[in-house]
Amino acid sequence: MKKISLLGSTGSIGVNTLDVVDRNPESFQILAMSAGSNVELFAEQVRKFKPKVASLYDITKIAALKERVADLDVEIIPGEEGSIAVATLPEADVIVSGIVGSAGLVPAIVALKAGKILPWQIKKL
């Protein structure tokens, strides 16, 4: 089973990745996930996939996220620190990054420096 850390779970790459994981639970597990600011969708995803670590980049919405997942055993880490934690989680086999543009650079670089597999995906050429 491949253990996945997912950066940008609420965008199209993230949503499609979660769809693949959902259809193949014997092959994949989400260990950690992050999102930008869509707290409603992200809370639903956290409730469904039950990661060990969840990160919301928009620190003004952390309280709302914590409230929505208070009954779950999930560590919530805000902001860029959280994205880095998701990208470098030791137990993760693969880091899937759906973060658009330069915002995804730091998590991608730290994931690679940590020796993680980081599949390359391009939405638009």
Predicted regions and their residues:
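N-terminal glycine-/serine-/threonine-rich beta1-alpha1-beta2 phosphate-ribose binding loop
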Residues: 1-102
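ADP-ribose/adenylate-binding Rossmann-like module
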Residues: 96-99, 112, 116-125
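Hydrophobic alpha-helical segments in the ANL/AMP-binding
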Residues: 106-110
